[in-house]
Amino acid sequence: MNPEIPTILALTMQRLAGGITEHGAAFAQGQMGLIGMMMTLSAKEYERGAEIRVAENSDIRALFAALAPEVKDAALKAKLEAAAAGKDESLLISKLNANNYALRRLLTEAQVYAEDNGARAAEQRIWAVLKAMAARRLVQLGP
């Protein structure tokens, strides 16, 4: 989820400490609605945040393992193989995010390579992983 929960909580504290009642009841009511929505999103993220990141990282690594044998660029192939062999050492969100960001940067590199080299099957596999990632991160406000 972006922004991350610490950012949402800090913003909430700023809103509450900033004297929202000074601007009138309508403004305060709007701010409280916004804060309530942010807290609901934070609760949902808290519940599923680690699971989403672990699944994404696993899917990306599996994709790299599948793509690497077809890559002719030696440097990219080595990066894909190294990333595919990696694993998440911690379930801390900050550590999972760091791994996820690094994997996503390499995924972008792999996608550019696939597009530049007409590797349509690789492109389709990449898009399937991206679609699954987007579906996992979808946030619904209802129950």
Question: What does each model-found stretch correspond to?
Answer:
Residues 42-89:
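Aromatic-anchored, charged helix-turn/loop surface patch used as a conserved interaction hotspot
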Residues 29, 33, 37, 56-63, ...:
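Short, surface-exposed, charged/polar-biased interaction segments
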Residues 6-62:
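N-terminal interaction modules that seed assembly of large macromolecular complexes
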